[in-house]
């Protein structure tokens, strides 16, 4: 019996002895990955309540195996070797939201596109710009995601989170420390459970028309026919003012179409890396490192990733850090 199978069976047995809900073993992370990349998770669970999530986290604190909580996976690159612990997925049981006047309470697993359309239909303005962003509300809040130089944090009033030990607490907007594409939640051991937003009254017809325009523009501008994680690199305001957004910098460096294995810098939009079929995590990481080095050599700006890399052992950090460690000597400088 190989080590992975031993880990999987040992952890599953321990979990089943403690909990009475369903666990699955050796579940392919490729099937839940927006990039369609990833090996098997030793054990996989989709809890049905906040209490179950907290209980699982508390239990895993005393186990040697790693644990991670994921939502829509739009900003995650999974290790092609898999994950040697417990993956907790915020699925359909955490996808609800309630609109009460101008205030919205959304579970972390709620779909961003569905939420945006619902609030626009109700005539509430403020987050239509995020209508085409794939993924879930929890992930959007962690990254302070958005478009048009805006972020969801502008409208967040409070967030319910749990720490790595399963203890719940509420954070207000000031405590969340939102900055451009960042928050105190990023790179922390907290998991977002619920989010409260406060929007402003607007015109439903105008908001829905704006949403359709945004979606139409995205469909023309961004690759939708191949698996991808959305924007790979963060837009740096300083770089933006001189060079432009990451996609332009990558395109100007002549890197559109650069390929390794089945992974490619999209010909449609250079800030997207697409999977043509059987790309590996190494393929993606190699492209990330190559792009960073080439753009830096031409512009003097270092582009960081929006994407986080989840290793087999549970290391969870920005993909560019892993990429540069694995591929320190790439030299693609072109005339």
Curated annotation (Swiss-Prot):
Pathway: Cell wall biogenesis; peptidoglycan biosynthesis. It holds the Pfam family FAD_binding_4. GO terms for biological process: cell division; cell wall organization; peptidoglycan biosynthetic process; regulation of cell shape. It comes from the Bacteria. It is found in: Cytoplasm. Its EC number is 1.3.1.98. InterPro entries: FAD-bd_PCMH, FAD-bd_PCMH-like_sf, FAD-bd_PCMH_sub1, FAD-bd_PCMH_sub2, MurB, MurB_C, MurB_C_sf, Oxid_FAD_bind_N. The active site is at 181, 231 (proton donor), 306. Residues 36-202 form the FAD-binding PCMH-type domain. GO terms for cellular component: cytosol. It catalyses: UDP-N-acetyl-alpha-D-muramate + NADP(+) = UDP-N-acetyl-3-O-(1-carboxyvinyl)-alpha-D-glucosamine + NADPH + H(+). SUPFAM superfamilies: FAD-binding/transporter-associated domain-like (SSF56176), Uridine diphospho-N-Acetylenolpyruvylglucosamine reductase, MurB, C-terminal domain (SSF56194). Keywords: Cell cycle, Cell division, Cell shape, Cell wall biogenesis/degradation, Cytoplasm, FAD, Flavoprotein, NADP, Oxidoreductase, Peptidoglycan synthesis. PANTHER family: UDP-N-ACETYLENOLPYRUVOYLGLUCOSAMINE REDUCTASE. HAMAP family: MurB. Cell wall formation. Belongs to the MurB family. This is UDP-N-acetylenolpyruvoylglucosamine reductase 1. It comes from Corynebacterium glutamicum (strain ATCC 13032 / DSM 20300 / JCM 1318 / BCRC 11384 / CCUG 27702 / LMG 3730 / NBRC 12168 / NCIMB 10025 / NRRL B-2784 / 534).
């Amino acid at each position: 019996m190989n080590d992975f199978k031993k880990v999987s069976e040992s952890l599953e047995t321990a979990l089943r002895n403690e909990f009475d809900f369903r666990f699955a073993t050796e579940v392919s992370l490729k099937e839940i990955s927006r990039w369609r990349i990833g090996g098997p998770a030793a054990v996989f669970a989709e809890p049905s309540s906040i209490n179950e999530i907290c209980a699982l986290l508390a239990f895993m604190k005393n186990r040697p195996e790693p644990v991670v909580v994921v939502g829509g996976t739009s900003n995650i690159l999974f290790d092609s070797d898999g994950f040697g612990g417990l993956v907790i997925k915020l699925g359909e049981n955490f996808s609800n939201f309630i609109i009460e006047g101008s205030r919205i309470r959304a579970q972390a697993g709620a779909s961003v596109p569905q939420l945006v359309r619902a609030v626009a239909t109700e005539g509430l303005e403020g987050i239509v710009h995020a209508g085409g962003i794939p993924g879930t509300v929890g992930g959007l809040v962690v990254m302070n995601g958005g478009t048009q130089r805006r972020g969801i944090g502008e409208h967040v009033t409070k967030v319910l989170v749990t720490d790595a030990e399963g203890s719940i607490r509420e954070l207000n907007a000031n405590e969340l420390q939102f900055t451009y594409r960042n928050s105190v939640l990023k790179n922390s051991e907290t998991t977002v459970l619920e989010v409260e937003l406060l929007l402003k009254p607007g015109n439903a017809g105008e908001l829905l028309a704006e949403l359709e325009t945004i979606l139409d523009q995205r469909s023309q501008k961004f690759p939708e026919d191949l698996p991808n994680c959305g924007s790979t690199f963060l837009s740096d305001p300083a770089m933006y003012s001189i060079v432009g957004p990451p996609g332009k910098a990558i395109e100007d460096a002549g890197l559109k179409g650069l390929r390794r294995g089945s992974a490619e810098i999209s010909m449609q939009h250079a800030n997207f890396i697409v999977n043509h079929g059987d790309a590996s995590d190494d393929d993606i990481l190699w492209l990330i490192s190559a792009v960073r080095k080439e753009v830096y050599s031409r512009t003097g700006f270092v582009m960081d990733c929006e994407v986080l890399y989840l290793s087999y052992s549970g290391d969870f950090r920005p993909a560019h850090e892993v990429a540069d460690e694995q591929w320190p000597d790439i030299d693609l400088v072109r005339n």
